[in-house]
From Swiss-Prot:
UniProt source species: Legionella pneumophila (strain Paris)
Locations listed in the record: Cytoplasm
Region (N-acetyltransferase) residue spans: 254-461
Record-listed UDP-N-acetyl-alpha-D-glucosamine binding positions: 8-11, 22, 73, 78-79, 142, 157, 230, 336, 354, 369, 380
Residues reported in the UniProt entry to bind acetyl-CoA: A383, N389, Y390, S408, A426
Record-given protein name: Bifunctional protein GlmU
InterPro entries in alphabetical order: Bifunctional_GlmU, GlmU-like, GlmU_C_LbH, Hexapep, Hexapep_transf_CS, MobA-like_NTP_Trfase, Nucleotide-diphossugar_trans, Trimer_LpxA-like_sf
UniProt entry keywords in alphabetical sequence: Acyltransferase, Cell shape, Cell wall biogenesis/degradation, Cytoplasm, Magnesium, Metal-binding, Multifunctional enzyme, Nucleotidyltransferase, Peptidoglycan synthesis, Repeat, Transferase
Length: 461
């Protein structure tokens, strides 16, 4: 079977009150259009056609790597007109699945069932299969009209509906599947004699009835699958729906969330056994948490891997890091891209790292900046230590070998190497390589000024 998918993404999204096209607004860390394209890809179609119009160049430039065929709708004359723009690119014998870019939570299984419905009754001549839903509040959506035999014979849009039709709770989702040859016959016959003055795709139902093409429907099991986004309130509602489902899936697999309503996933999160996640944590990109990991409140992890038994304390930010087993991080720590910790390391409060590689058992417990640095095993970095890695033009590396003890308030001016088991005295500024097994310090002699008096505040005139 040749499957062609059309995604409608040309709408202006006026009710978003935004300069950003609606389909580029984010849900769970990804643009709405990306959600729909990724779902479509799972159906293994022969092609995905995205119909763009308003803000089209911005959409294309923001999502340059989407595996789609872009089709321009120069004038936004309605959903039927939008689908018509793609038809010259689609073979007559292909099956066409029409999706909306602002309906992001449609599920693959539902779409597979709808495609099967479009073939089930008459494999040689496709039926028109519609995805419908029963909603308690169907306001704003097209209503399904059935005859006395329960057969669909029309869809009436909200703006064209009378009060009797508005009381119907069965709605059309905007998702349908049929043979391309059917669409090529029906779409040129659409009329714009309606309240909007547009060519509605829903009018193909009456044309199918006239042509005696069978119409079948599939009712979505979950109402969120057919919920569209037209304003920021609806975007927020679907965001919470997505997050609640993600939280439930994690808990079903054994993770503990302190509060599933205060959890945000903006990518992929993989948890081992007995993982604990406190409130207000954000996970972005791909995050892997090993067995027994604990994440404290208000933490942000982006593209991070944590080994077994790690604990990240409150208000810590980790990005692009690989952390081995039994490490402790925070509170208020910031680990930037390129940070790697071997097992049993500690990064304490108000420590920032960047391109820092720690070997086993190394600790930096307080108030330090460690950038472009290699640290050996069992190094102790005192409070206030800074690797001075930038000369105003280039970055330089600091190497600290095994067993080094660095006293508090030390500046290491890179490039510099500190030899194994060396000790650096507190308050030192190290500009040259430090020999192993020795004490090195830069001494400024302490002086006492006897008889010195503090200044006295002058009386004002």
């Amino acid at each position: 079977m040749n499957l062609q998918i059309i995604i409608l993404a040309a709408g202006q999204g006026k009710r978003m009150y935004s300069d950003t096209p609606k389909v580029l607004h984010h849900l769970a860390g990804k643009p709405l259009l990306t959600h729909v394209v990724e779902t479509a890809q799972q159906l293994n179609p022969d092609a995905i056609h995205v119909i763009y119009g308003h803000g089209g160049e911005q959409i294309k430039s923001s999502l340059p790597n989407l595996p789609v065929h872009w089709v321009h709708q120069a004038e936004q004359l309605g959903t039927g007109h939008a689908v018509l723009q793609a038809m010259p690119h689609i073979p007559d014998d292909a099956y066409v699945l029409v999706l909306s870019a602002d309906v992001p939570l449609i599920q693959v299984g539902t779409l597979q069932s709808l495609i099967e419905c479009s073939q089930r009754q008459n494999p040689d001549h496709s039926v028109l299969a519609l995805l419908v839903a029963e909603l308690e509040n169907p306001s704003g959506l097209g209503r399904i009209i059935r005859n006395n035999q329960g057969e669909i014979y029309s869809i009436v849009e909200e703006k064209d509906a009378n009060e009797q039709v508005k009381n119907i709770k069965e709605i059309y989702s905007g998702v349908c599947c049929t043979l391309a040859n059917n669409l090529k016959k029906w779409l040129p016959q659409l009329s714009n004699s309606n309240a909007q003055g547009e060519y509605y795709l829903t009018e193909i139902i009456s044309l199918a009835v006239q042509n005696k093409t069978p119409i079948t429907s599939l009712t979505a099991k979950n109402s969120f699958e057919v919920q569209g986004i037209n304003n920021r309130q609806q975007l927020q509602q679907l965001e919470r729906t997505w997050q609640q489902r993600a939280a439930n899936q994690l808990m079903e697999k054994g993770a503990t969330l302190a509060d599933a309503n205060r959890f945000d996933l903006r990518g992929e999160l993989y948890c081992g056994k007995d993982v604990y996640i406190d409130i207000n944590c954000i996970f972005t990109g791909k995050v892997v948490l090993g067995n027994g990991c604990k994440i404290g409140p208000n933490c942000s992890l982006t593209n991070v891997t944590l080994g077994d038994g790690c604990e990240v304390y409150a208000n810590s930010v980790l990005e692009g890091c690989h952390i081995a087993n039994d490490c402790h991080i925070g509170p208020f720590a910031r680990l930037r891209s390129g940070t790697q910790l071997a097992s049993h390391c500690k990064i304490g409060n108000f420590v920032e790292t960047k391109k820092a590689i720690f070997d086993e058992g190394t600790k930096a417990s307080h108030l330090s900046y460690l950038g472009d640095v290699l640290l050996g095993k069992n190094v102790n970095v005192g409070a206030g230590t800074i690797t001075c890695n930038y000369d105003g033009v280039n970055k330089h590396q600091t190497i600290i070998e095994d067993g080094v003890f660095i006293g508090s308030d030390t500046q290491l001016v890179a490039p510099v190497t500190v030899g194994a088991n060396a000790t650096i005295g507190a308050g030192s500024t190290i500009r040259r390589n430090v020999p192993p097994d020795e004490l090195t310090l830069t001494e400024s002699r302490q002086k006492t000024i006897y008889g010195w008096k503090r200044p006295v505040k002058r009386e004002r005139d």
